[in-house]
UniProtKB/Swiss-Prot annotation:
Highest taxon listed in the record's lineage: Bacteria
Name of the featured protein: ESAT-6-like protein SAG0230
Organism whose genome encodes this protein: Streptococcus agalactiae serotype V (strain ATCC BAA-611 / 2603 V/R)
Xref: InterPro entries: ESAT-6-like_sf, T7SS_ESAT-6-like
Pfam family, one: WXG100
Residue stretches in coiled coil: none
């Protein structure tokens, strides 16, 4: 049997932290992608080609991680709603 010791509000606060983390990761990737363009304009050769290939290979994984954090946010919000509704349902049964 599972046990959740967090209140719905605490779960919502945690969910928001995941959204904040996702946005931070997206912001960093945007800045680094812009910087990559600057480097691209000023560095020619096979060394840069390898550098750019590595960056381009990893960028989608970073984007996927940011999306995963958003997905976790949504899951936590749903859990908070379920906990809140379950508590309300139990309370209404006791008060009958």
């Amino acid at each position: 049997m599972s046990q959740i010791k967090l209140t719905p509000e605490e779960l919502r606060i945690s969910a928001q932290k995941y959204t904040t983390g996702s946005q931070s990761i997206t912001d960093v990737l945007t800045v680094l992608t812009q910087e990559q363009a600057v480097i691209d304009e000023n560095w020619d050769g096979t060394a840069f080609d390898s550098f750019e290939a590595q960056f381009n290979e990893l960028s989608p994984k970073i984007t996927q991680f940011a999306q995963l954090l958003e997905d976790i946010n949504q899951q936590l919000l749903k859990v908070a709603d379920v906990v809140e509704q379950t508590d309300s349902d139990i309370a209404s049964q006791i008060n009958k």
